[in-house]
Amino acid sequence: MRFSPKRVDRGTALLVECMKTEDGDKVLDLGCGYGVLGIVAARRARCKVVMTEINARAAALARRNLELNGVEGEVREGNLYEPLTHETFDTIICNLPMSAGLRHVFEIIDGAKGHLREHGSLQVVVRKGSGRVEKRMFEAFGNVETVAKRGGYRVLVSKMPG
């Protein structure tokens, strides 16, 4: 697993720019790494943020970064949705871990439906050339929109029906 120790990677930066949340939303930063997406959501829209991370070192960094940035949030260690039981969210944000393989990425997409509220959205960033990811999001949700493209990355959004 790789982290960007000195700067936010380009994909995460693009998702930060495009992320849509409302005041008071409950947001899940799935596979949060050191917490950039969740921290931005908490600061921008005063969201209730839950972050999950399987890597103990990254989870510890996310907790520390929440503290350093003076924002509320909860970091739970575990794989993907496992630490969440039956919780639901208004928004799930994720920098899809393409290096983990499509099977893992598809688990993220398919699992999102069980953790999104009515009208909730899955907002992800992925490397360009990810037609199979876009197709899977459409199959899972019946919709997918490319909201941004830059530097080899795309931000894709699918929404739950209401």
Indicate residue ranges for each PLM-predicted region.
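Short beta->alpha hinge that forms the Motif I/post-I loop of the SAM-binding pocket
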Residues: E53-R57, H104, G129
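Conserved class I S-adenosyl-L-methionine
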Residues: R127-G142
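Class I SAM-dependent methyltransferase Rossmann-like catalytic core
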Residues: M1-R7
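Conserved beta-strand signature within the Rossmann-like core of class I S-adenosyl-L-methionine
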Residues: H119-V126
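A short glycine-rich, Lys/Arg-flanked "PGG" loop and its adjoining helix->strand segment in the class I
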Residues: F106-E118
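Conserved SAM/SAH cofactor-binding pocket of Class I
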Residues: R10-C94
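A short SAM/SAH-binding and catalytic strip from SAM-dependent methyltransferases
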Residues: T91-R103
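Core SAM-dependent methyltransferase catalytic element
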Residues: K149-G162
